Amino acid sequence: MEYSLGLVEVSALGNAIIMLDDMLKAADVEFVATERKLGGRLVTIVVRGALTSVKASVDDGVAIATKYGCLKASQVIARPHHEIFKLLHLD
């Protein structure tokens, strides 16, 4: 099955956990990776699923992160190139 990736970057690990919980409840997506930088002060959450589900999940994550004032960036990648999975350690 071809799927899309959704990424949301926030400040602070606690905020990332709260956001991820809502993202997973908002749509049929799977949590696949996290990247922590600056000792956990900057966290990127990665989910995958069907494009519409990933968009809904990322939109929900952005709303939660904005509410807490911790949003840094977000992105949805439809049909990601297989080389991206090496970066995420999913190959």
Located regions from the model:
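Short glycine-/aliphatic-rich beta-strand segments at the starts of folded cytosolic domains
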Residues: M1-V10
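Conserved short beta-strand edge segments in small beta-sheet-based binding/regulatory domains
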Residues: K67-R79
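Short amphipathic alpha-helices in soluble, non-transmembrane regions
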Residues: S57-A63
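A short linear hydrophobic-aromatic micro-motif
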Residues: V29-T34, A73-S74
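Helix N-cap motif at beta-to-alpha junctions
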Residues: R48-V54
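Short amphipathic alpha-helix segments
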Residues: G14-A26
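Short, low-order "capping/linker" segments at domain edges
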Residues: E83-D91
